[in-house]
């Protein structure tokens, strides 16, 4: 990260000191900078109470997004913040009004503020369980939009479901569709017992590849944080680009690169970052980037030197990180979105994220619903052909 401090630019305003809220009651429409100034404790206590916590709904992710997204998007973002009678924050909903192509027709949509930048998964509205969400619906009704789209929702997202129920009570129409498959592992407490769940061929391959590397090379796994954070990040990006031969990859978009540089710094400060390389004879051959949140280890991205493909260095490093998660007492290992073949080799379990589209009542909403229904029908007919 080229010597970048923990927070620069917009993120410099994301301090850990919270804004005094004791005099506020009800729903307040805030800028993203003011909402982030409430501090990580306010955001993350809601994340922790929202079923399985999602790192992508956290203060850290939103702060990194705000320092990476187009300036106009950040300026246009509104965060609906519900304050209880004692001034404590009961709910947070960061949204952005933008023009999108809905079924090829340009419309004004309300979406998650963070959009799909950086591929966030398992999202949900942030609220305490006892907070009624009708007040947020009233605030949403005051904003000008034609469709409200909540993408990348966690399966059975509790608060999004409650929000949709409140919207339906006002006559708004809610439609759902599956989105992304996210493979995951439910971890036990023993590495060998996990290996026993794999095919015998898979087990033998894993053991043989690691044994050969240790026999033929000085093999080590290096973890990066603190003073070595820049070094580790640069090695990850370099190996990721080599894997794609300079023609693609997750970090080709400068905004995505900047977002993760900011997020990685915050994760490292919280001791939640897993940034590692597998080194052979003193040189990095593969890299792994993920993070912990609650009882889950999330795998985000990796890279490898193609010269070591025959030795399966990526396979060996992934096995080491899964084993570390098991031995560290974590309960779940989440591969995040995408049914890549290498993910299916580790697990058959997957969660499906969801997209919810909400239509207002009236002729405009009816027309957009009809447009949506026709597009869905065409898709089903094409699938049968």
Describe these PLM feature segments.
Residues 2-19, 23-25, 29, 97, ...:
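Active-site/acyl-donor-binding loops of N-acyltransferases
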Residues 26-112, 152-182, 186-310:
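A conserved beta-strand-loop-helix scaffold within acyl/acetyltransferase catalytic domains
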Residues 117-131, 302-310:
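A short, internal acetyl-CoA/4′-phosphopantetheine-binding micro-motif in the GNAT/acyltransferase core
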Residues 127-130, 150-155:
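Structural motif
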Residues 129-140, 310-322:
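Conserved acetyl-CoA-binding loop-helix of GNAT-fold acetyltransferases
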Residues 140, 267, 325:
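Hydrophobic pocket-lining residues that define ligand/cofactor binding sites across diverse proteins
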Residues 145-153, 325-337:
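Conserved GNAT acetyl-CoA-binding A-motif
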Residues 282, 314, 321, 325, ...:
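Hydrophobic, well-ordered secondary-structure elements that form the walls
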């Amino acid at each position: 990260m080229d010597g970048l401090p923990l927070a620069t630019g917009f993120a410099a305003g994301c301090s850990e000191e919270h804004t005094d809220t004791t005099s506020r009651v009800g729903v307040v429409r805030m800028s993203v900078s003011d909402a982030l100034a409430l501090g990580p404790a306010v955001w993350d206590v809601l994340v922790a109470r929202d079923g399985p916590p999602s790192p992508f709904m956290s203060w850290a992710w939103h702060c990194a997004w705000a320092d990476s997204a187009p300036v106009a998007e950040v300026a246009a973002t509104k965060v609906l913040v519900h304050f209880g009678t004692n001034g404590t924050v009961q709910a947070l909903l960061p949204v952005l009004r933008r023009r999108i192509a809905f079924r090829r027709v340009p419309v004004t949509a309300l979406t998650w503020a963070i959009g799909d930048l950086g591929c966030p998964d398992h999202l949900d509205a942030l609220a305490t369980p006892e907070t009624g969400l009708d007040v947020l619906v009233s605030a949403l009704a005051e904003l000008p939009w034609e469709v409200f789209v909540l993408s990348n929702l966690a399966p059975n997202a509790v608060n999004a479901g409650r929000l949709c129920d409140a919207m339906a009570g006002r006559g708004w129409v809610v439609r759902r569709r599956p989105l992304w498959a996210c493979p995951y592992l439910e971890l036990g407490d023993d590495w060998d017992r996990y290996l026993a769940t794999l095919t015998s061929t898979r087990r033998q391959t894993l053991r043989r590849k690691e044994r050969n590397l240790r026999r033929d090379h000085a093999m080590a796994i290096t973890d990066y944080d603190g003073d070595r954070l820049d070094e580790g990040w640069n090695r990850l990006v370099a190996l990721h680009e080599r894997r794609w031969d300079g023609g693609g990859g997750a970090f080709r978009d400068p905004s995505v690169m900047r977002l993760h540089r900011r997020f990685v710094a915050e994760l490292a400060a919280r001791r939640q970052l897993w940034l590692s390389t597998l080194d052979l004879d003193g040189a990095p051959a593969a890299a792994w980037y993920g993070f912990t949140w609650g009882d889950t280890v999330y795998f985000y991205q990796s890279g490898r030197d193609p010269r070591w493909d025959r030795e399966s260095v990526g396979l060996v490093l992934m096995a080491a990180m899964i084993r570390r998660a098991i031995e560290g007492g974590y309960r779940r290992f989440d591969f995040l979105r995408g049914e890549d073949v290498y993910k299916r080799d580790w697990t058959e379990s997957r969660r499906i994220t969801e997209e919810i589209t909400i239509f207002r009542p009236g002729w405009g909403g009816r027309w957009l619903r009809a447009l949506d229904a026709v597009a869905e029908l065409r898709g089903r007919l094409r699938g049968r052909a």
